[in-house]
A protein has these predicted regions:
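NTP/phosphate- and nucleic-acid-binding module
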Residues: 1-38, 116-117, 368-407
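Acidic, turn-prone loop/beta-hairpin segments
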Residues: 45-56, 60, 170, 176-177, ...
């Protein structure tokens, strides 16, 4: 029996023997009403001091003109709102309101039909929902996100929305830490990035924040890290200007490029493929930045000299364009300025993602691991068209392998 069948068989046997039965235990949680405002969602309950009654005139509308006289709710000081006559009974209205979690449980749906006056939602909500990507703190896992699913299914049952889930993908971002602790005014360990922005620029600070850690992990703030990001931006600035001063090259037939040029173009397109995947699917911005850094290091510096061949200059230009387009979502001011220097009549924001050549994603070389008695002893690199017999011969004649075969 598999697990489910065994579970059913045990339940059936226990019931037949009258020694047990199946019961569902729900892990229900109290609704935390803690972030209240007087203008929060009103609770439609009336009381005569001994018994509670439902308000019959719905919706309950809060007054727009109130006076704040202290820390208590201003609604308690408004007799015209507080006191209600319902079927001859003098009742007192509930002045507590639901907290912010109540509205945030369905705000994403209301945004899609914000100007609908006849209903909570209209057909536009079904067009936009579910939310493709939802980003929020992990502290919402058992509160806001739970309530949102509850609300969405209530709205589904009411015929307001279609589907079962409000969010398709969820990313819980980490915290920014200072000295290993969560930033807090009471601890005095807060950081104001404005000073760093004024010194290094917004692009530098943004680059550091996205490069320092994966989005789902906590980030330890470091001024030294900001300086490192600034050095990289300066390097890109110098690289592009060196390329511009060397002069741009005419097109050439990539099918006639030599081995080094083809390897460099392969590196460019593999990086484009990885960065696109990191941005759109994995949301791994730190690895995307690392890949661009690696590409910028791999371009031979002599290709940026005016003495370099037209083919080298053209591949260098392809690399520079790709680097700027990949960095543009993170460092838009830098990339726009450098793009204008390359192409004064163009704006980088109007450019599409470069077309990735699938043929350049396939390696011409393969790495083959060689094991002896189940243990890795060496590794060889071969052309992908190499025949099996040649691979075996290369492995058997490998110095590290010969040593182990002789034992």
């Amino acid at each position: 029996l598999n697990f489910d069948d065994a579970f059913q068989a045990i339940e059936k046997k226990a019931t037949a023997l009258n020694c047990g039965y199946k019961e569902t235990n729900f892990r229900l949680r109290d609704w935390g009403v803690s972030r209240q405002r007087y203008w929060g969602a009103p609770i439609p309950i009336l009381s005569d001091g001994e018994e509670n009654f439902h308000a019959k005139d719905l919706p309950v509308e809060l007054p727009s003109k109130v006076e704040f006289k202290g820390v208590s709710s201003p609604l308690k000081d408004m007799p015209e709102f507080l006191k209600v006559d319902q079927e001859g009974k003098a009742l007192i209205r509930e002045t507590d309101t639901f907290d912010t979690f109540f509205e945030s449980s369905w705000y994403y749906a209301r945004f899609a039909s914000f100007d609908s006056h006849d209903s909570m939602l209209d057909d536009r909500a079904n067009y936009w929902l579910p939310v493709d990507q939802y980003i929020g703190g992990i502290e919402h896992a058992v509160l806001h996100l739970l309530y949102s699913r509850f609300f969405f299914r209530c709205m589904r049952d009411m015929g307001l929305v279609e589907g079962d889930e409000p969010f398709t993908n969820l990313l819980c971002q980490g915290m920014v830490l200072k000295d290993g602790a969560k930033m807090s005014k009471s601890k005095g360990n807060t950081i104001d990035p404005q000073g760093l922005i004024e010194k290094y620029g917004a692009d530098t600070v943004r680059l550091f924040v996205l490069f320092a850690a994966p989005p789902e992990q906590s980030l330890e703030w470091s001024d030294q890290g900001v300086q490192g990001a600034h050095r990289f931006i300066n390097r890109i600035w110098k690289l592009v200007n060196k390329h511009i001063h060397a002069g741009l090259s005419e097109d050439f037939d990539v099918n006639h490029s030599n081995k080094d040029l083809k390897l460099m173009r392969s590196k460019i397109h593999k990086t484009l493929f990885k960065v696109k995947d990191d941005y759109l699917r994995r949301h791994s911005f730190n690895t995307a930045i690392a890949a661009v850094m690696e590409l910028s290091n791999d371009i031979p510096q002599e290709w940026f000299d005016s003495s370099a061949s037209p083919e080298m200059r053209k591949v260098a230009n392809e690399a520079i364009e790709s680097i700027l387009l990949m960095l543009n979502p993170i460092t838009p001011h830098l990339c726009q300025h450098l793009w204008w220097q390359l192409y004064p009549q163009e704006s980088i924001i109007d450019k599409s993602w470069p077309k990735i050549e699938e043929s350049l994603l396939i390696d011409d070389k393969l790495k083959i691991a060689i094991q002896v008695n189940g243990k890795l002893r060496s590794e060889i690199e071969i052309d992908k068209e190499t025949e099996d017999d040649s691979v075996k011969s290369m492995a058997l004649n490998n110095e590290k392998i010969i040593k182990h075969l002789a034992c």
